[in-house]
Each structure stands twice: as structure tokens, then as C-alpha cells.
Amino acid sequence: MAEAVLNSVAKQLVEMTLNKTKYDEWDLQWYTESPFWRRSNMYFSREYKTIPDYELGNIKHGMTLDNIKVTSENLIDFLKIYKNEVNIDEMQRANYLLDHLQHLNLRTRYLMGEKFSFDEMTDGLYCLVAPEYDYRKFDSIIEELKQALPGKGTIQERIEEFKHKIMVPRENLLGVLTNTTQYFHDVTMKKMHVTGNSMPRVRVRELTDKDSVFLSILFGYDYNHLEYERNFNLLYPWTVDKVMEYIGHEMEPGHLTYFEKRLQSMINTCWPEMSIVSLFSSSNAFSEGSSRHAYNMCFDNSMSKQVEFEKEYIFEPAGLDLDLVELMELWHKYCEIAGYGKMETSRNIWDGKWTIEEGSQFLEKYGFCSKGDGEKEAASYKDDIGHYVAHDYSRDTIREYFNSYSHDIDKQWELYEKLCSSHMSMREIKDKTFRPYEMVY
């Protein structure tokens, strides 16, 4: 009885999420409408993105934002009472559906004009509230860079110069991306129960939007296979750290592996909620954070092993200066701290504590954006929906959770695979109490 009731709630959650995309077009990150799908025509573009990877058509019409708000509120009230009747083995699913209905409701209210503080928003969308970062770390990392980075001029100029020196030349980009993709695919195959049929085709091209990183085309899927093409932008500045991020976390063992495991879970269980991943949800916060930790696991959570990989797979084939390899560990540390700098800028602008000009000055002071770009980037944070909370803070929250579970790398891989198919809870991951049911019984 409980499964039928929860299936009914989940079906309505999916329908409302699909309908909301009419008003919130970038929300739906992944959708599998059936156990299998094949693209039946060639009406797609390699010039602009479609989110999700194919047109939803009429299924995104039928409900207004007010309809979604009222219906989600009614389902939230119902689930809060109904939870008292479910069995222990259905509690995680009930909690998951309740969380995601609350995410949907808050995002809908925001689209209708309701105002929230930054922390209220990230709590409502991702079940995460990031504490204020230690601002002393911004000054500390700059001092480390001053001592280590080569070159002359201001530290901001030396940061820009270093980025340029670790940028993969466009003539070498396809080979570097292809071989890096193959490596991460092989590790994923070794560590997880995946079929091995889902490694994307890698292509490079100049995209219309020079700031766009890549463009994906989904040609089909079934239980054992995602048929994907990923076009990487030749106009994007492909530094070594960006190659690592956009291969390891965006593809395998990151997002694409997560999508594959959710698809398999949907087919195995017929749970409607496993067919979607909404950008504004704790599912996406888990995916963003865990995918970053998962690509670290490919190197046994060892930065020295990761840097050795970068030397062999990126520096050498790209013809980069090998003397710079020894600086990569410090550079990765800086990149992580930069994410928190952007998070704090976003929070302070959102909450009205900083002006755009103050945010711009902060970003440029620490080299978190190029000189002259601060105002444009800071202005974009007026409408930021907690991106860096769902990405950077989520990564560190999940990293701590995995390490609290076990430092054994094989056990962490086992945990990751289970979580990809589970009704995860970011709140319980935050307090380190969550265990997928398959690992409890």
C-alpha cells in the first residue's frame, strides 16, 4: 500500500517538475521518460544547448506556477502526516520525496517573486547552509602564491600568467581530452558495476558562445548504455585544472555515471522520481559534490598521484612546461579556495551586504577573476541560486562524509555506487548519519 501511495506522490513531483521547466528552462538536468529511448531524427544543434538533452514538447505545459505552488504544498502537508505510517524500509524514500517537494515549492515561490535570504534559499533548495568561510584563508593562499609562482609583476598578473602557461594548446586539445576521458572511464569500469558502454564520444569545435564549456547531444539510452556526444569548446581556456574538472566530474565517474545508475534504479524499481534530476534540488547538490570527490577517488584521494597523472596525460602530450608540475598541488588548493571566495561574494551580494563594486574589487583582489572582469562576474551573482554552495561546499561536505565512513578507497567506491542509486539525504550526509538501505541490512 505504501509503495502505491509514494509512487502517486512521486509521479506528481515529476509532472510538476516538468511543467515548471516552461518557466525555469535550465532546471531539468536529466530526464528519462521511459526504460529506453532513441533519437529518431537529426533535428538537433551543435551550436546551442538544450536542457535536458531533448525537447520536452507538450509535457512541460498544463500547470501554472500557482498550480505548482498549491499542489506541492498540499503534497508536503500530506507526506508529513503519512510519514508516520510508512515502514522503516520506506522512510528514506518518503523523506527524499518530502525534501524534493520542498525544493520544488521554494523555487516556484522564488519564480513568483517571493524573497529569501541566501541561507534560506540554499537550505530550501539543497538542504545545505554553508557557514561563513574563514576570510584569513584568502590572504594566506595569496601569500603562498607570492612565494611560489614564477614571473614578475603583481600577484594578480602572475596568476594570469600561470593560467596561460598551463593552458592546453588547441591543436593538442582533442588528444588530451580523449585520453583523459579514456583513463577516467577505465577506472570507473574497474571500480563500479557499469557496463562500459557509456563513454561519450569526444569532439572539439568552436561553439557560438565563447564562454560555453561544452555542448552535449544525447542520441539514446537503455539499461546498459548512454549514447552521448560531447563537443568541447575550442574557445574556452583549457587549463590543466579545467581539463580534470570537466572530464572527471562532468562525465565518468561523475555526472554521467550518476545518471546511468539512476536510470538503472528507475528500471529496477519503477520509482518515478529516479527519472529526473532537477538543478535546484539536493539530488543535484549530491551529484555536484560527489562527482568531484569521485574523480579524486580515481587517484586514491592522493593529490600527489593526481599531479603525476596530470604530468603524464596533460602536461607532456600538450607540450607544457614540466617545471610547472610541482606547482599544481598548490594551484589546486588555490582553485578550491577561489570557489569559496566566489561563494562569499555571491552570498554578500544576494543579501545586500556588498555592492556590485565591492564584490568586483574582492574578486579581482584575490585573482578570482581576471582584471576588468570583476564587475561583470559580481553582477551575475545578483541572480545566483547558490551555485557554489551546491558545488564547492557540497564537495567538502561529501568528502568529510566519505572519510568518516571509511578511509579504505574500495569501501568509498562501494558507498558512492550505492548512493548514486539511493534516496540520499544531504542533511544526513552533512551530519554523517546517512546509510543507503542496502548497506544497513
What is each of the regions a protein language model found here?
Residues 1-441:
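N-terminal maturation segment of proteins
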